[in-house]
Amino acid sequence: MYTYAGYPAVLCVLGLFRRRAVRLDESYCPRVILIISVHNEERIIRDKIENSLALDYPKDRFRIVVASDGSVDATNDIVREYESRGVILKAFQRREGKSATLNRAVLGLDADVLVFSDANAFYREDAIRKLVRNMPDEEIGCVVGKLVYVSNHSYVGRGESLYWRYESLLNGLESRLKSVLVGTGTIFAVRRALFSPLIKDVANDFQLPAEVASRGYGVVYESGAVAYERSTFFFREEFSRKRRIIVRGLTGFKALRTNFGGGFRMFQFISRKLIRWWVGPLLPVLYAVNLMLLSNPLCLTFFVLQNVFYALAIAGAIMRRGGVQSKMLLVPFYFVMVNAASFAAIVTYVMGRRLASWEKAETTRDAHEHAGFAPQLRVIEGKKDLSYTGKHKGMENLEHIT
């Protein structure tokens, strides 16, 4: 329970005594380059570029770079159509993975701030302004934006939306201490001067915040900088994605452990990530221990509760396959799925497999195709229904709950 409830409680207490305010300046407009990582994104790259061009930021202070990692579809041709509007294509023939692609793309770029994004993430119109308003504070080296999932009403989609609301809560609590642990790969900004070459098997949104913090700069969360992304639909896609993230996280920790040292950042990593990742492998162990100690009333109670919880998760899986969904079964189903993925990830890591190339979830692209990201979708942010009325390109009909 510590990793889910105890750690947030510790952050709340620390925030009362160690809170460090950020000096904001709404008029601050540094030179910004938005880097979009892509691999075979012909279905949505046009909408992404249109969304990026429509962002509210001075055009003479803003450039868009599309870093294409071995794309063999029409992605590069579509991007070239926008070169007359200032979009820069950096196309690399050989696929080497996201980190290698970003390293090559950043070479020679002259800017004050780099913003990293993916093709399937659509920014709210003021997202860049909200990110950089934190940068006049010279203590700040990295700013993490808010990812909001557009739910497809599947168990997996709703579960992921719930998970990211929890992650956003942690980001907000850590931000009070100017020490957000990890970035959000679809929307985060780093000072150009603080960018360092990315390690092949390590996620950029894990490595860059860690290295920025190790150099004495703060990492903060900006809830006003919003990116919308469609959640996955299929179990196998989300399972594979979670497994990949955890493997890369473990790889990153091994490669960057000196950056964490033995101080607060190490405490954060253990509390927020490492313990959580090990919950999956420990659940079967806990089940077996309780089974062997049924004569103990406390162990018997836990054993019964475990069986009830797993039964609810199985019921949720069965009902999902039958097209029936229950909110009551969502949490057990998603919890078991995520921890099964963490178990698989640790096995993968121990066996020595590393995942340098990113494999996109196809259903996160399906809703964009021929629709300009304007199907009747919902973003789960709270309980109240509001009609989305923003002017952001490709998002006109988006409905969300806030």
PLM segments and residue spans:
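Acidic helix N-cap motif at the loop->helix transition within catalytic regions
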Residues: R43-D47, V72-E81
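Catalytic donor/gating beta->alpha subdomain of glycosyltransferases that bind UDP-sugars
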Residues: M135-Y166, K200, N204-I270, A340, ...
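Cell-envelope/extracellular polymer assembly enzymes that use nucleotide-activated donors
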Residues: P30-I33, R63, Q207
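Short, well-formed alpha-helical segments that are part of the catalytic scaffolds
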Residues: A9-A21, E41-A54
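Short aromatic/hydrophobic "clamp" motif used to bind/position activated sugar donors
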Residues: L114
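Membrane-embedded multi-pass helical conduit in multi-pass membrane proteins
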Residues: V13, R18, D25-E26, R276-R354
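Long helical/loop segments within the catalytic core of UDP-sugar-dependent glycosyltransferases
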Residues: S99-T101, A105-L107, S117, E125-V202, ...
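A conserved acidic beta->alpha catalytic loop
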Residues: I33, N51, P58, S68-N76, ...
